[in-house]
């Protein structure tokens, strides 16, 4: 999970 069209929280695009 990560930032899918949302403001990036703690992660970016991690599994």
From Swiss-Prot:
Top-level taxon: Eukaryota
Tissue: Expressed by the venom gland.
Entry GO CC: extracellular region
The keyword Transferase is assigned to this record: no
Compartments, record wording: Secreted
Keywords, comma-separated and alphabetical: Secreted
Function: Does not inhibit chymotrypsin or trypsin.
Protein name per UniProt: BPTI-like protein
Organism of this sequence: Daboia siamensis
